[in-house]
Amino acid sequence: MADKILIVDDSIDNRKLLLKTLGKGDYILLEAADGKEALARAFEFLPDLVLLDVMMPELDGYQVCEALKQDPRTADIPVIFLSAKAETQDKIKGLDTGGVDYITKPFDRGEVLARVRTQLRIRNLMKELIDKQKRLDEDLRAAAVIQMSLLPQSLPTLKEIDIAWKFIPCELIGGDIFNVVLLDENHLGFYMVDVSGHGVPAAMVTVSVSQVLQPHSGYLKKKSDSPPYYKIISPKMVLEALDREYPLERFGKFFTMVYLILNIRTGKLIYSSAGHPPTVLLHPQRPLDLLSQGGTIIGLGGVIPFKEEEKVLSKGDKLIFYTDGVVDFQNQHGESYGEERFLALLRSLEDQPLELILDGVCESLTAFGHQARVQDDVTLLGMEFKDIS
């Protein structure tokens, strides 16, 4: 489609000269004899470029340009000023009011054509860039919807435990997911994953991992020939399988993960961590424990073998899973929230109900950051062991 150029000059001779100069090009040419007519035609036709005379009656070129820049319909239209004034301060004034270039009279035909072509090329490139950015924004919004859909829609409701979670997404699309999976009538699986990076690539890996970690996928439990005709896979073996499935060279992404299996009848748990921040075990009236046993991140091909650890929960014990978006959160001074501050807060809140503990962490982050946006997803998952009777 041909570019539209609006020529604004109170001199009919100048307009004719410009029409003749540009007439051989593939342009749609529009005219205006003064500032008021220029604004009316610009708002009606939305040209791709305006050639604007400076010295005109009533509204001069600077005033017209300012009016164009103040209206969102015409703010992005490039304006080239036309003037017999060649002083530096006149050119500066034109650029300050929103012009992109300045052509002095009398016109040189070659210069006019070159400057017009240049500004139209820049405008068309800007249009392409804006269109690409819009498509990218749409992709990111779609990825955000996908990420939110991966968060637990419902969690197991059992008398033996309470479960609560909080998720604060960052502006960029992150790669945090978590879930609580009912493996059988006695066992729950808890996992939390943090994929490296942001944006659509991280979201795609997140989707894939979430599908793999479904109970029916064969990664968390598999069929057996003897009663009960299934076998729950240990955390160590789950991480090893994921490490084989998601090599760094295949996806260009790695991820940290913690996977924990809890027997809700006995309180016995077994877990393993792949480079993930340690799960916090809060005991009533006793020092907390950090569950950090495991190996390296998923994607490095088992550089460090994964290990497991077992614990037995007592009534009132709480588990707090989290991603590094909590401790790495920075305020406006570049100071990190940090693990020490986080653990001290958990100790001060350990007697509170689970929901209030997680709320307290989010409130503390907000106060620390003075309303600053989180730089990474903040993900918290809590569990309280209530009864073994």
What are these regions (language model features)?
Residues 31-40, 61:
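Helix N-cap/capping motif at the beta->alpha junctions
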Residues 9, 53, 83:
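Active-site residues of response regulator receiver
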Residues 56, 68:
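Receiver (REC) domain active-site loop signature in two-component systems and cognate sites
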Residues 45-54:
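Active-site beta3 strand of CheY-like receiver
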Residues 3-4, 12-30, 40, 44:
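Two-component/phosphorelay signaling modules centered on CheY-like receiver
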Residues 312-321, 326-389:
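C-terminal catalytic subdomain
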